[in-house]
Swiss-Prot record:
The chain crosses the membrane at residues 15-35, 321-341, 343-363, 409-429, 506-526. Interacts with the Sec translocase complex via SecD. Specifically interacts with transmembrane segments of nascent integral membrane proteins during membrane integration. Belongs to the OXA1/ALB3/YidC family. Type 1 subfamily. GO terms for biological process: protein insertion into membrane; protein transport. This is Membrane protein insertase YidC. The keyword Isomerase does not apply. GO terms for molecular function: membrane insertase activity. Pfam families: 60KD_IMP.
Length: 544
């Protein structure tokens, strides 16, 4: 077996592992978003479901009486929250500090509230009516309605409490009181329907962001994925997660059921009632970045407004197999960013540091390849001499390697040992929340979490799924070709078709594979290629 075939197999193995890694990363990290809205009109009638208007008015002190559906907009330090007096639900929740591609606050709620809502309480029947509204203060808001069930009158309150600090958390309280000291209506439990569609995206953003949705649940100290028909008792929390944002819900002693309706997977939170005269249940909702800086503060009671502890929201951020390698890498990136506040430069500097640290492996692999190159004349003689006797050829090749003190796989192991570092860097740059919206070169690379763009088509090209003309993929391809040529000592005249494909076809294939990848990842790749070219020149000079 000659040297070129060994190199070919090594490269194929590396590419296979890289492709497998990227495939597994896509499959297990996400489920593609799918949602259909409706324009169905909803008619409102203040007296529709309540017969005794005198009781209705006497109980409304401090609440606003509104005879038509109205949106209530609340602004906090971190949210623009919009509530509807129809059913008293939250219909929009925008993050003030995290903008979308249109430079508007990102809206985490993606539902058509005329027909279904983000977080809907389902009692014996759904109270489809207008609610009274009361603003206690800027952080506390209540919605109240009254309904009859089997001739008995009940007060129904939904209370929303925002955090005093800049925490992406709110408390949602469900209160149902019997006004005539009745036992609660004849049910053992009630449900909260959690619509799993989050992060409302514009058409442009849908074309740009590779945005996926996962239904997640944390149970028995393990992160699991929701699926149709799944039922779990007493999970720590449930939620919906996209690449950069998530909504997580926690409450003690709840049961969760997952059910697919109209193609959308929904979560049903089942809450036991028993023989009580009232309901007063609290739910804590995290709605914000998928970032441990904001998630982990709810593990210690002294670190958050509501005094929560051991919620484990931070476990929603999956740890890759290379997590132990990623942690120091991110720390190094942060150090560079603190000195020069530009995440693009931080990626470049981190890549250079990593390449310097693994230089001994690179040098060892190149030297092993050079030693094999010196044996090429003798290897060709043996191949000609024993071309009809493969067994004898292998024996003589083995004897030659032993006599010359050369390991034929010496150039392969250093390459394979570098793969975990590549995987760790890939995961870090591809998923780091800090890169979302981070500009490298204004006007060209405005967001390191998506591809660069010099021209947007406004639609997706059918065959290649391109939405923009991008420059970085071309730079990546040409630097990859340069790195391949410099590293391989190519004799173009003597290359076979298979080798030509390996050396020239692979960079072109990666051009199409990585075309829509985040620009931060391509900056890492380009920096690696350029550093490799300079590194190989140095090694050749040293060995000569």
């Amino acid at each position: 077996m000659n040297q070129s075939k060994k190199i070919l197999r090594t490269v194929y193995l590396s590419l296979f592992l890289i492709g497998l890694f990227m495939l597994i990363n896509d499959i297990f990290s996400s489920i593609m978003l799918s949602f259909k809205s409706s324009d169905k009109e909803v008619q409102f009638d203040l007296n529709k479901s309540f017969d005794d208007n005198e009781i209705f008015l006497s109980k409304s002190n401090g609440f606003d009486l509104i005879n038509k559906s109205q949106n209530i907009v609340v602004e906090t330090e971190i949210y623009f929250a919009t509530f509807s007096t129809f059913r008293g639900n939250l219909v929009s929740l925008k993050l003030k500090n995290h903008l979308n591609l249109e430079k508007d606050p990102t809206d985490l709620i993606n539902v058509d509230y005329k027909n279904e809502t983000f977080f809907d309480v389902s009692l014996d029947y759904l109270v489809e009516d207008l609610f009274l509204y009361k603003k206690i203060d800027n952080l506390n808001h209540e919605f109240k309605a009254y309904f009859k069930n089997h001739g008995k009158i009940y007060e129904y309150v939904k209370k929303y409490t925002f955090s005093e600090k800049n925490e992406y958390l709110m408390k949602f309280t469900v209160i149902v009181n019997s006004l005539n000291d009745y036992d609660l209506f004849d049910i053992d439990s009630y449900k909260i329907v959690f619509s799993s569609e989050i992060e409302r995206l514009s058409d442009k953003a849908k074309l740009q962001y590779n945005n996926y949705l996962s239904q997640i649940i944390y149970y028995d100290n393990k992160l699991k994925y929701g699926k149709d028909g799944l039922s779990i008792n007493n999970p720590r929390w449930i939620g919906s997660s996209t690449k950069y944002f998530e909504v997580l819900i926690s409450r003690e002693n709840m049961e969760v059921e997952f059910k697919k309706e109209r193609g959308v997977l929904k979560s049903f939170i089942v809450n036991n009632v028993g023989n009580k005269k009232n309901i007063s249940d609290e739910f804590f909702i995290y709605a914000g970045p998928k970032d441990n800086r904001y998630l982990d503060i709810f593990d210690k009671s002294g670190d958050n407004t509501f005094g929560l502890s051991d919620i484990a929201f931070g476990m929603s951020v999956e740890k890759s197999l290379w997590y132990l390698i990623q942690v120091p890498m991110q720390m190094v990136m942060q150090v560079f960013y603190d000195v020069i506040p530009n995440w693009g430069l931080s990626i470049i500097f981190l890549t250079i540091v990593v390449r310097i640290l693994i230089f001994p492996l690179t040098f060892k692999g190149f030297r092993a390849t050079a030693e094999l190159s010196k044996l090429q004349p003798k290897m060709k003689e043996l191949q000609v001499k024993f071309k009809h006797d493969p067994k004898k050829l292998n024996e003589e090749m083995g004897r030659l390697y032993k006599e010359e003190g050369v390991n034929p796989l010496g150039g392969c192991f250093p390459v394979i040992l570098q793969l975990p570092i590549f995987f760790a860097l890939y995961s870090l740059v591809n998923n780091l929340f800090l890169l979302r919206g981070a500009s490298f070169i204004p006007g060209w690379i405005d967001d390191l979490s998506i591809g660069d763009s010099v021209y947007n088509f406004g639609y997706r090209l059918y065959f290649v799924s391109w939405t923009d003309i991008r420059i970085l993929p071309f730079i990546m391809m040409f630097t990859q070709l340069g790195s391949t040529i410099v590293s391989s000592n190519l004799d173009l005249k003597n290359l076979g078709a298979q080798q030509k494909f390996l050396y020239f076809g692979m960079p072109i294939m990666f051009f199409f594979i990585l075309y829509n990848m985040p620009s931060g990842l391509l900056i890492y790749w380009i920096t690696t290629n350029i550093f490799t070219i300079l590194q190989q020149y140095y090694i050749k000079m040293h060995l000569s």
